[in-house]
UniProtKB/Swiss-Prot annotation:
One of its GO terms (molecular function) is ATP binding. The gene is argB. Keywords: Amino-acid biosynthesis, Arginine biosynthesis, ATP-binding, Cytoplasm, Kinase, Nucleotide-binding, Transferase. This is Acetylglutamate kinase. The keyword Nucleotide-binding applies. Substrate binds at G70, G71, R92, N194. It catalyses: N-acetyl-L-glutamate + ATP = N-acetyl-L-glutamyl 5-phosphate + ADP. One of its GO terms (cellular component) is cytoplasm.
Amino acid sequence: MNADLTVVSPQIQAQILAEALPYIRKFHGKTIVVKYGGNAMTEERLKHSFARDVILLKLVGMNPVVVHGGGPQIDNALKKIGKQGTFIQGMRITDEETMEVVEWVLGGEVQQDIVMLINHYGGQAVGLTGKDGGLIRARKMNMPDRENPGKFLDIGFVGDIEAINPAVVKALQDDAFIPIISPIGFGDDGQAYNINADVVAGKIAEILRAEKLIMMTNIAGVQDKQGNLLTDLSAREIDEMFEDGTISGGMLPKISSALDAAKSGVNTVHIIDGRIEHSLLLEVLTEQAFGTMIRSH
């Protein structure tokens, strides 16, 4: 879909709008949670098109909520201080120094970049971390050691979500703002925790009873071992792919969170290619099959 409608004929413009109309009606007033990450966050062209897409969804009556990642930005910041990112099962090992970097990169640089772009194009975005309004209460994660059943790995200040308080998000939605959420949780003692953005997006979608959860990635969707795109995955198929290692690394928390959201009542969960310009609009406002749909059954 080309965002610049001035370069196509009036007939094609009308066709594009007509195709979107049923979806605008269907999703009017509904919450759409978007996990925003990958190339869509780092390439200037994609950053600008994403901001405009989110505004359009808001203008036609939907309630977009954006949960952003920022892995490449964190890695770049760590390199500047002589540190290298290390991951276990898709989770970043987060010592005290790394946690400080995560906080100022996600809650500062990355979040503000998204907010400013959306506001630049006429939207009204507000940035949040888990501390704002008690949004995300977290505790230290005890990661199971897969090589030693019954034992756990200490990966630092990485958090599990204890509770989501959606009041601040709902208040912003009621006042026509677009919430932009950084995946940082806080413990009862005020300790900050780094939480995987896919996990936060899934839980936010569940608590808000979202109509859709859309996860933007750097691949076309979930692929089999031969690299073929799988357009539709059931819970049983996902379990089999976990067992045989088809799904591994950073895809583990992504698929687990997507499946949990589907099982918890989010109507549709999609993993889409964020490298494609306007992929968000293609998913929400057209009939085009796109990425991978996750089913709870």
